[in-house]
UniProtKB/Swiss-Prot annotation:
Keywords: Cytoplasm
Protein name: Ubiquitin domain-containing protein 2
Extent of Basic and acidic residues compositional bias: 32-41
Domain Ubiquitin-like: 152-227
Pfam families: UBD, ubiquitin
PROSITE patterns to which the protein is assigned, alphabetical: UBIQUITIN_2 (PS50053)
Subcellular location: Cytoplasm
Length: 234
């Protein structure tokens, strides 16, 4: 990524200047700016969808490049930044020897020169946020007629790392499939967020409308640990 990122800090706290012509301003380490990025989502987004998008990023980003401990530090710094605790965010960044050439978490470098880019949706909510649908509306989803449609298997990959095949019916809604997963694995429907081809699936969508190819894996982000009932020991 260019040796300038791995250069020693001088007494002013800035990286030594280097002019290798990389086209990236790596010469300076600026303090984290307090201004939050303003952005608009491609579609109106609920708080739950925003959390799902963030969970998906943090679950997958360390697998592609960079060091896990730096990703962990950036996640903690991003949370502190959004919570307006700028001193904590800056302390986390400094403690992990992370360089911010532009004073923003959207472009960061570790001391080995690895580059890390945080999407704006991990730093601030969009300007077109909408209210979450109420639980009452979810309860209004009608039950499909017994034995309607046809039975099929759906491959799921949970964010806990578990893969499984779930028996569903073609007339099931996503909400009813969540209930089936709850019965099989103990994951509350409200703690599940389903994704197909990177698109969040809403509770009212029907399986037959999703056109999921055979053996295609549907991602399920679990927002709490799976709770398996265990006997109480006296």
């Amino acid at each position: 990524m260019g040796g300038c990122v791995g250069a020693q800090h001088d007494s002013s706290g800035s990286l030594n200047e280097n002019s290798e012509g990389t086209g990236v301003a790596l010469g300076r380490n600026q303090p984290l700016k307090k201004e939050k990025p303003k952005w608009k989502s491609d579609y109106p987004m609920t708080d739950g969808q925003l959390r799902s998008k963030r969970d998906e990023f943090w679950d997958t980003a360390p697998a592609f490049e960079g060091r896990k401990e730096i990703w962990d530090a950036l996640k903690a710094a991003a949370h502190a930044f959004e919570s307006n605790d700028h001193e904590l965010a800056q302390a986390i960044i400094d403690g992990a020897n992370i360089t911010l050439p532009h004073g923003a978490l959207t472009e960061c470098y570790d001391e080995l020169g690895n580059r890390y880019q945080l999407p704006v949706y991990c730093l601030a909510p969009p300007i077109n946020m909408i209210e979450e649908k109420s639980d009452i509306e979810t309860l209004d989803i009608p039950e499909p007629p017994p034995n309607s449609g046809y039975e099929c298997q759906l491959r799921l990959r949970l964010s806990t790392g578990k893969d499984l095949k779930l028996v569903v019916r073609s007339t099931d809604t996503v909400f009813h499939m969540k209930r089936r997963l709850h019965a099989a694995e103990g994951v509350e429907p409200g703690s599940q967020r389903w994704f197909f081809s990177g698109r969040p699936l809403t509770d009212k969508m029907k399986f037959e409308e999703l056109k999921i190819p055979k053996d295609y894996v549907v991602q399920v982000i679990v927002s709490q640990p799976v709770q398996n009932p265990t006997p109480v020991e006296n």
